[in-house]
Amino acid sequence: MKAPPGRRRRAARPPARTHRTTLAFDSTGTARLGIIPRHGRVVTEFADLTQRGASAARIGNRTLTPADLVAVVADCLIADARDDLHDDPAGITLTHPVGYSDQQVGELRAALDAAGLQRVTLVAEPVAAAAWLEAEHGPLMPGLALVYDLGGASLDVTLVRVGAGCPDNPVMGTLRSRDFGGRAFGALMTARAVHGRSGGEPGGSPAPDLAGELRGEHVRESLELVYRCLRLADVTMADVDRVLVVGGAARPAEVARVLGEELARPIVIAADPERTIATGAALMARRAAASAAPAEPVSAARPWVFSRRGARRSARVAAAAAVSAGAIGLTLAVPGDAVFAALSQLGVG
């Protein structure tokens, strides 16, 4: 189907699957994603490699680092997204927080390779978000977009170059604060309710209108992080063409409304902002798979496997072709979000 004259056809929206960011291992060492069994150990709080004291796990005679656990989850999700991925190879992109150091990205890359996932591409979250922006609202003129990622456990503000001619690394500056997000706002609401400042009885739930007012205040207070990010990149708000709002805590209407009023720039937000990054990752994977040349089989060390179908798949991973009829984008939320989202886009073009 062709788009109407003067309008660009939007990219098809990939179907989504979401899971809790938890891993349980049975007696055979097989990983179970997103479940909390009645008996046995559950591993949580491993998703953010920047978090001090992030969980590790010992399975059999192997100790799994947080990066290893992320690779296990990615392997489980890939198996879940496609019934037999390695019989019908697809492009795969896994996003990571933009604030990861080179060492942390290297640890994640090494863990994926050890799990037999050498063809998974790593990309920073705001770069994937910008890919969604280009697909939904492009073609974009060369310029700057500010990605306001309000998640469950933190707020990430990132300046990204968009449009034709942007460099391989389009990120100009980024800052993170754990003082904002779903968890911080929930604590604020609880404090107001406990101290009887909700307009109702002490200990009661805050009234809906006050909840919206508090959320607006929460967003306004976060603007200092936005301005600090602008100063870091040596630009002003006048240099920013649009603000892209993403993240699971960005869904309430007050978030986009307050940002639009205070920043005086066009606000772009998807109907489901928690999916924006994963959708962008899937679109990037599809483009990469469509443009790649067939890969030659390579020999590799036997991968360690913990997913339920890993033994069947790992024998085929080295011979998988790079040209694909589909794509998968994976994004891992920080602990406060507690979800790992996988999206599969079937069909290239």
Name the predicted role of every residue range.
Residues 21-23, 162-206, 210, 328-332:
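Glycine-rich phosphate-binding loop plus the immediately following alpha-helix
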Residues 261, 266-268, 275-303:
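N-terminal intrinsically disordered, acidic low-complexity segments at the extreme N-terminus
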Residues 287-349:
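Acidic, glycine/GT-rich loop-and beta-edge segments that sit at the periphery of enzyme/chaperone cores
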Residues 94-104, 214-218, 235-260, 273-277:
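Glycine-rich phosphate-binding loops at beta-strand->alpha-helix junctions
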Residues 72-84, 133, 216-239, 252-258, ...:
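Phosphate/ATP-binding catalytic cores across multiple sugar-kinase/actin-like superfamilies
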Residues 117-148, 278-290:
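Conserved phosphate-binding catalytic cores of ATP/NTP-utilizing and phosphoryl-transfer enzymes
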Residues 2-93, 222-226:
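Conserved phosphate-binding loops in N-terminal lobes of ATP-dependent enzymes
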